[in-house]
């Protein structure tokens, strides 16, 4: 059987992975707080640990891996968004507004992560569905002397857990010395953190032995992982930004509640994401959601390839140049596997993935299969990285095009300054498909000229889903026109519904 080696953040070493139970390998990844769209950095752990999930299934069998990724749907940011709606005059209850917001955000998240080719986890628990389990764990921590109640708050006694700081390599005293925050008067120790906090009548809350309130962030993952995976499981993963305090606090409360378990054996953290060499920030104007990039025309498969091009343990830099290179690579690979049947996953692709999830090395191995014209091996092996070349083959952006038909005259320098539109496709373009595509182009360009970019982006996304890529392009004399790329299978009647 293939040996997998993973870097364990806690031991700071690359270790041979040996599951507790080969018939049920268990993985927990911290999921999103569902108050807004997932940004580009949020997508990285999804793709990275999706590949880990696929690798574990490949080695141990699809039915022998349990993957849990949670949704945090109780949070002050969610409350603030709902309160803003209510203050703006929405007559519905705060509970209804919160539920609408979280349901909508989860739907967005699924749509965006599906576009990135990520498999759905085995379980996706919502925190609000496990409040009872959180209360039970808090009661247990109090009974064992690891937590205390003050003024409606329940706090974890950090100094009661002697190994606190082992994951992040910090000591409690150093953390206190470096702190620059005001300490709540009800805390016994500045490092103690909240397990439960009171809710006033305006905020969401649940009845508990300490009064009406809501859970702290850290207890949510501890309770849900225990209920779904047990006191001991194989791998806990997430972004490096969660290492402290979230994961450190998870370890403390879980190990104190269930000292017989030991919580997660292996801890994995992906590094942060940069954009053109700089930290992603709204103030720098380089902040993107996954949906922003999809709506700009970057296919989800291309975004995924850029993620995979850098080892998860190193910062990843998103650039348009990398995305264009990934697009070209995928187009070439998809063209070569035309008509091929998937072969077995090749060992030269499995080997780098088994060596601490070296996705860049696995992509290099796929490139070698392409160079050797091993279409079956390329097609089958790409699936292990979540790259479906057969599906990509039918995407408008990935097709080779046989000819071009233009509506209106060609633009000629100094002669014709009117915008024109073109339609290109694979094989014969029917009159109906050409006329419908031209109509969509004219409508899309008109919306852009009018400044209604939201409607224009929505039209472009809808057309792409139906097999037509709308693209603006300039002629040599600077006049903006448009081009529609048609896939080989286009539902023209559905397209007409967009006009």
Swiss-Prot record:
It catalyses: tRNA(Cys) + L-cysteine + ATP = L-cysteinyl-tRNA(Cys) + AMP + diphosphate. A motif ('KMSKS' region) lies at residues 279-283. Zn(2+) binds at residues 30, 221, 246, 250. One of its GO terms (cellular component) is cytosol. SUPFAM superfamilies: Anticodon-binding domain of a subclass of class I aminoacyl-tRNA synthetases (SSF47323), Nucleotidylyl transferase (SSF52374). Its main location: cytoplasm. It is found in: Cytoplasm. Its EC number is 6.1.1.16. GO terms for biological process: cysteinyl-tRNA aminoacylation. It holds the Pfam family tRNA-synt_1e. The keyword Zinc applies. GO terms for molecular function: ATP binding; cysteine-tRNA ligase activity; zinc ion binding. Its cofactor is Zn(2+). It comes from the Bacteria. A motif ('HIGH' region) lies at residues 32-42. Keywords: Aminoacyl-tRNA synthetase, ATP-binding, Cytoplasm, Ligase, Metal-binding, Nucleotide-binding, Protein biosynthesis, Zinc. ATP binds at residue 282. Binds 1 zinc ion per subunit. Monomer. Belongs to the class-I aminoacyl-tRNA synthetase family. This is Cysteine--tRNA ligase. It comes from Cereibacter sphaeroides (strain ATCC 17023 / DSM 158 / JCM 6121 / CCUG 31486 / LMG 2827 / NBRC 12203 / NCIMB 8253 / ATH 2.4.1.). The gene is cysS.
């Amino acid at each position: 059987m293939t040996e997998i080696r993973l870097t364990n953040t806690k031991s700071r070493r690359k270790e041979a992975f040996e599951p507790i139970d080969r018939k049920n390998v268990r993985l927990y990844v911290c999921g999103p707080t569902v108050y807004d769209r997932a940004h580009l950095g949020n997508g990285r752990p999804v793709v990275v640990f999706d590949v880990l999930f696929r690798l574990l299934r490949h080695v141990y069998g699809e039915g022998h891996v349990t993957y849990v990724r949670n949704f945090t749907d109780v949070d002050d940011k969610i409350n603030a968004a709902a309160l803003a709606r209510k203050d703006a005059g929405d007559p519905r209850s705060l509970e209804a507004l919160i539920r609408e917001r979280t349901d909508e955000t989860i739907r967005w998240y699924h749509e965006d992560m599906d576009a990135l080719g990520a498999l759905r986890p085995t379980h996706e628990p919502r925190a609000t569905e496990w409040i009872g389990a959180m209360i039970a764990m808090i009661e247990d921590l109090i009974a064992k002397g690891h937590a205390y109640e003050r003024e409606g708050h329940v706090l974890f006694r950090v100094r009661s857990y002697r190994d606190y700081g082992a994951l992040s390599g910090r000591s409690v005293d150093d953390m206190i010395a470096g702190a620059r925050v005001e300490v709540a008067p009800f805390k016994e120790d500045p490092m103690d953190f909240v397990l439960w906090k009171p809710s006033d009548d305006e905020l969401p809350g649940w009845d508990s032995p300490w009064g009406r309130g809501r859970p702290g962030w850290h207890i949510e993952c501890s309770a849900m992982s225990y209920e779904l995976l047990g006191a001991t499981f194989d791998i806990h993963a997430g972004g490096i930004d969660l290492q402290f305090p979230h994961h450190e606090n998870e370890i403390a409360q879980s190990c104190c509640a269930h000292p017989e378990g030991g919580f997660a054996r292996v801890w994995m953290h992906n590094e942060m994401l940069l954009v053109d060499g700089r930290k992603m920030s709204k103030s720098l104007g380089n902040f993107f959601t996954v949906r922003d990039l999809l709506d700009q025309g970057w296919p989800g498969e291309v975004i995924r390839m850029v993620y995979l091009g850098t080892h998860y343990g190193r910062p990843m830099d998103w650039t348009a140049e990398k995305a264009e290179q990934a697009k070209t690579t995928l187009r070439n690979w998809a063209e070569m596997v035309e008509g091929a049947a998937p072969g077995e996953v090749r060992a030269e692709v499995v080997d780098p993935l088994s060596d601490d999830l070296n996705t860049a090395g696995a992509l290099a191995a796929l490139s070698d299969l392409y160079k050797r014209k091993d279409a079956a091996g390329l097609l089958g092996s790409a699936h292990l990285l979540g790259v479906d070349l057969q599906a990509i083959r039918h995407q408008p952006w990935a097709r080779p095009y046989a000819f071009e038909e233009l509506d209106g005259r060609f633009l000629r320098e100094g002669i014709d300054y009117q915008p024109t539109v073109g339609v290109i496709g694979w094989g014969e373009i029917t009159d109906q498909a050409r006329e419908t595509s031209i109509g969509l182009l004219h409508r899309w360009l008109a919306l852009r000229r009018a400044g209604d970019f939201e409607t224009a982006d929505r039209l472009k996304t809808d057309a792409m889903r139906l097999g037509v890529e709308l693209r603006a392009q300039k002629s040599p004399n600077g006049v903006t026109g448009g081009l529609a790329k048609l896939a080989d299978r286009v539902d023209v009647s559905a397209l007409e519904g967009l006009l």
